A protein has these predicted regions:
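Nucleic-acid substrate recognition interfaces
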Residues: 1-219
């Protein structure tokens, strides 16, 4: 990291790489730290060899650290280094911000993922015990005789995804219409994934809150 950080400083002095001065310097340093950690993980055989992340990838992200309150939420805006105040839709109240990751998804949306300090509230011991049998026709059945079906809206979304993917396959490669259709497919993909995650989160949260012990069949 020390060597690459010195190289970055030298590159900023060169006219060819003057654009680096326009970027958030902390974000650039975090990228170098990520690269350093990736090689550490590789040489310690905890991960595969790091791969090049092209600027043309459909998913992009960068991380920057809060220093001297340079990242903060004010009303309906978040202040980011080099970008200033950006309007947001805030999903929940947050505490002290440590760092933020800005993500750009294939569906053309931006997300600010915040790492914050907060004090978790311990929940009372539910005391219940339940057994879960995951099925194919039904999502699962439990030892209390309850059955949870797979959501129909998820099936509809999957059918729509298949239709949009077929339309994409018929578009001419590198055409403007193919680009627009690719964005439609990405948005349906994202909606389907969000629906699935929302369903799973709600079911798992309900089971954990109502039971102290959960047994599930080993597949």
């Amino acid at each position: 990291y020390t060597q690459t950080s010195a190289m970055l400083t030298e590159l900023k002095r060169q006219e060819e790489f003057a654009f680096l001065k326009a970027a958030d310097s902390i974000a650039l340093q975090q990228s170098l730290r990520d690269l350093d950690q990736s090689f550490v993980n590789f040489f310690q055989k905890r991960a595969s060899y790091p791969t090049f992340k092209s600027k043309h990838n459909r998913f992009q992200s960068y991380r920057t650290v809060n220093q001297k309150d340079n990242i903060r939420i004010v009303g309906r805006y978040i202040k980011l280094p080099k970008l200033g105040f950006v309007k947001i839709r805030q999903s929940m109240e947050v505490g002290k911000i440590n760092h933020v990751t800005i993500e750009y998804t294939p569906a053309g949306k931006y997300f600010a993922v915040l790492n914050v300090d907060f004090e978790p509230e311990p929940r009372p011991n539910a005391g219940g015990t339940i057994g879960i049998d995951v099925g194919i026709k039904a999502f699962y059945s439990d030892s209390n005789g309850n059955t949870v079906s797979n959501p129909r809206y998820l099936e509809r979304s999957m059918r729509k995804l298949i239709r949009e993917q077929r339309r994409l396959s018929r578009k001419q490669k590198d055409s403007h219409n193919r680009g627009k259709q690719r964005l439609r497919v990405a948005r349906v993909h994202e909606k389907t994934a969000n629906q699935r995650n929302d369903f799973l989160q709600k079911q798992s949260t309900m089971l954990v809150r109502e039971n102290q012990t959960i047994c599930i069949e080993d597949p």
